[in-house]
Amino acid sequence: MIAGIAFAVLFAAALLTVPTLPGIDKPGYDIVSHVNEHSGAMRMQSLLVTFGSLALVVVLGYARDRLTGPPGYVFTIGSAVVLVEVFIATWFTAGLALHPDQLGSATARTITDIASMWGPILTVADIMVAVPILLAANDGRFPRWLGILAAVFAVEQLIETITIIGPPASFISPGGAMNFYLGGPLFIVFFLALGVALSMEQPAEVQE
């Protein structure tokens, strides 16, 4: 599905456009320096995420059409939460870049701390989306390979919840390496795969 590919390209570009914000162990003036250096790229990143989210909505909508019963309702709620969390996080990160020359250290540190909790909390919404896909794949509504990927994604996200309480300057710190370098790419791969699977014909026995 074109929407899945568009989502993956846009989100991957957004992920690579700007280096990660200084971690929770860094002082506010490091964040101010980062924002001043990358303010234009941060706003471009927000634009890429915005258009990527539109493509993601299409993927989620078509996926929901193949789900039934309670898993379908859970998927709907999870999809909505994913999108809301993405937009809220984007508000904060893009907002930092609007007036970089007027940004104070304390303000920068506070806003970045809030944005840093996006990845850790997003894990729960991702599980709410991945598990219904896994169940549907077991019922033959999606290819088995997608079910395996959904299981891997759900388990990884469950483990990644540890970043909610992870210590500073560690792999599992909030908004740190685990969220950005492991969870982020896997998030993109899963929804790309979901879009690809949706472009494939359903087995005849599960078609309505």
Predicted ranges, named:
Residues 1-208:
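Hydrophobic, aromatic-enriched alpha-helical segments typical of multi-pass transmembrane helices
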